[in-house]
Regions:
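ATP-dependent carboxylate/phosphate-activation module, predominantly the ATP-grasp catalytic core
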Residues: 112-122, 133-181
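Rossmann-like NAD(P)H-binding beta-loop-alpha module
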Residues: 68-94
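Short, hinge-like loop/turn segments at secondary-structure boundaries
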Residues: 19-21, 62-65, 90-93, 112-113, ...
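Conserved N-proximal alpha/beta basic substrate-recognition cap immediately N-terminal to
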Residues: 1-73
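Basic phosphate/pyrophosphate-binding loop/patch that engages nucleotide-derived ligands
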Residues: 63-70, 114, 121-124
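Short glycine-enriched loop/turn motifs at secondary-structure junctions
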Residues: 69-70, 99-103, 179-180
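Flexible loop residues that form catalytic
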Residues: 23, 79, 98
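ATP-grasp fold ATP-binding core
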Residues: 64-65, 89-105, 126-141, 154
Length: 181
């Protein structure tokens, strides 16, 4: 295999398949690569449909709900949502921007005063958030699908001593948990 960078879109037709190993989002260069690979008839992970579906947490929540897939209770939050309504989820509560990935734009409020502060910060950047009760876990799953079929599942473990798979230091650095699979 060959590693290609974000400026190598023109060379994509020279390859047999594309396995994206960077952040995926509709407004990211990875999406253009994915669309181009699909239009060339190449196998691609992550395919454009998966990026659209999985990069928006609110869309994904509604899709799972519609298909009866079990998940944590959740609430879609806007500036008009009374904070008291969010308290019904209990504390700690996790707030997620719709388009964050790899632990970015996911924050945890331990108590009501934290919730008020985080809501103000996050709603200044996004009109909607997804709120869920915090449920401790040792890992998240990443599922790979190719042409509608399960290809792989791997565990993304939480960063050591942290509640997310990635811990950011606020200076552009981060550390991650180990990956299995």
């Amino acid at each position: 295999f060959e590693v290609i960078g974000p400026r190598a879109l023109h060379s994509l037709p020279e390859h047999d398949a594309l396995f994206i190993r960077t952040v995926t989002a509709v407004d990211h260069v990875s999406f253009r690569f994915s669309q181009t690979a699909e239009s060339l008839g190449m196998p691609v992970i992550d395919d454009p449909q998966s990026i659209v579906r999985c990069s928006n947490k609110i869309y994904l929540h509604e899709l799972c709900e519609r298909h009866g897939i079990p998940m944590l209770p959740a609430m879609i939050v806007s500036r008009k949502t009374p904070a008291a309504e969010l308290h019904t989820l209990g504390f700690p509560v996790v707030l997620k921007a719709p388009d964050g990935s790899f632990s970015a734009a996911v924050r945890r409020a331990e108590k009501p005063v934290d919730l008020d502060r985080l809501l103000a910060e996050m709603l200044a950047k996004s009109p909607l958030l997804l709120a869920q009760p915090f449920s401790p876990t040792d890992f998240d799953w990443r599922i790979g699908v190719l042409e509608g079929r399960l290809l792989y599942a791997c565990k993304y473990h939480m960063a050591r001593g942290h509640w997310q798979i990635a811990q950011y230091d606020g200076k552009g650095g981060s550390r991650s948990g180990r990956v299995e699979g």
